[in-house]
From Swiss-Prot:
Gene that this sequence comes from: rimP
Species whose genome carries this gene: Acetivibrio thermocellus (strain ATCC 27405 / DSM 1237 / JCM 9322 / NBRC 103400 / NCIMB 10682 / NRRL B-4536 / VPI 7372)
Entry's family note: Belongs to the RimP family.
InterPro entries per record: Ribosome_maturation_RimP, RimP_C, RimP_C_sf, RimP_N, RimP_N_sf
Places the protein is found: Cytoplasm
Function field: Required for maturation of 30S ribosomal subunits.
GO CC entries: cytosol
Pfam short name (any one): DUF150_C
Upper classification of the organism: Bacteria, Bacillati, Bacillota, Clostridia, Eubacteriales
Record GO biological process: ribosomal small subunit assembly; translation
Protein name stated in the entry: Ribosome maturation factor RimP
SUPFAM superfamilies reported for this sequence: YhbC-like, C-terminal domain, YhbC-like, N-terminal domain
Assigned keywords, A-Z: Cytoplasm, Ribosome biogenesis
Source taxon at top rank: Bacteria
Length: 154
């Protein structure tokens, strides 16, 4: 079974649990770090996720994973908040964080640059749109973008 297939199965398992608590399932990752595998489930809610929220979701999902056993080897389960500088992946993320400062990293340089910062204007027709320097609009084809994340300045 591939990583992608495991992530899809776990997403199907996690969605009802997360929705039951009125949280948002932000992402599911199944990755290998060193010699260990990690199943990471990121959840969020307006106002932010607490440790207690993570614990409740972790326990419920762990019980289901133990019964259904969709992962053929050992792993560590982690449930957490995606953090303030969370990557934006879904169309709903782009809508939710419209008007906020974001960083866009592209795979190949555009005019010699791979990182762009600006106000998120939106997501339309598979393009991410930001406003740089107050009013200069830039559009990025989604498949040419490696990462979009919020920029948090203190």
């Amino acid at each position: 079974m591939t990583r992608k297939e495991i992530e899809e199965i776990v997403t199907e398992i996690a969605n009802p649990v997360v929705n039951k608590h009125s949280f948002e399932l932000v992402d599911v990752e199944f990755i290998k770090e060193g010699s260990s595998w990690y199943l990471r489930i990121y959840i969020d809610k307006p106002g932010g996720i607490t440790i207690d929220d993570c614990q409740v979701v972790s326990e419920e999902i762990s019980d289901i994973l133990d019964k259904e056993d969709p992962i053929p080897h050992s792993y560590f389960l982690e449930v957490s908040s995606p953090g303030l500088d969370r990557p934006l992946k879904k169309e709903s993320d782009f809508e939710r964080f419209k008007g906020e400062l974001v960083e866009v990293k592209v795979f190949k340089p555009i005019e010699g640059k791979k990182i762009f910062e600006g106000e998120l204007v939106g997501y339309k027709d598979n393009k991410i749109i930001i406003k740089k320097n107050g009013n200069e609009l830039m559009e990025f084809e989604r498949d040419k973008v490696a990462l979009v994340r919020r920029v948090i300045k203190f």
